[in-house]
Amino acid sequence: MKAMVYGNGESRKVWDVTKRYESFITWGCNAIHRDCVVDNLVVIDYAMQQEVYQSEYAFSNKCHFADWAILDGFDPEFMKENFSSENIFETPKTDWDKCVVQGKDNADAESNYARIHNKFPGMDEKDLRIKCYKDVGLYITWLGQKDRVEDIDFPRNWSAGTTAIHLACQEGADEVYMLGFDLSNSNKPINNVYKGTDHYLPNDSKGFNPVNWISQLETIFDEFHEVKFTWVVNNDFISPTSRNNVHYMFYKDLDKLCQV
């Protein structure tokens, strides 16, 4: 089984994600739901999960959400006491008395900021603070019946892109094509198709240190050593790893392959 996994790096702008290829199972991450339908949508951040759920995408299409713990008959009113009104994001309550409650407060954000700043004192303080305070708030999502959301059992605390690749392998893919996995550089502008839009960092944000993403990818390549991974890249991509089951291809060559 072939899987095509879309990351949200800007290199994939040359690729038409709305095209459907019968020989591939498609996987996408986060805001790609705004542009197209994929066979499997992976969403890690709770603000984006709420966006996807409110759009009703999750009622027609298979989704994989992180930490999607459903509470039955739960009253979240007492939790609102720790948040200002502008930081409470609650969807309309439905007849089905089930919800998912997620979020972080300012204290959590400040703790993360202090921890990272102490470890990497040379980082841009303003940029780091924006990253740490992203999505501060209480997110209460009231559920409807017959959605197609599945809670992600494993992996946990990974990025959406690497989680999608791992899930594709779990579901039996023996060939995985990775598009838009451009990694990042903390000294360069952020590389993301959706930067500057709702639930994403501003256009002028800096990138991330990719060390965790690379580690997660290498874990996948080693665990699923019998799977053939094809990293679809642009001309200036520099590989961060060397594994015998990882190959590289330009977008134009993948397009030719898909025409066959």
Regions found by a protein language model. Give the residues of each.
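Metal-ion/cofactor- or nucleotide/acyl-coenzyme-handling active-site neighborhoods
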Residues: 1-260
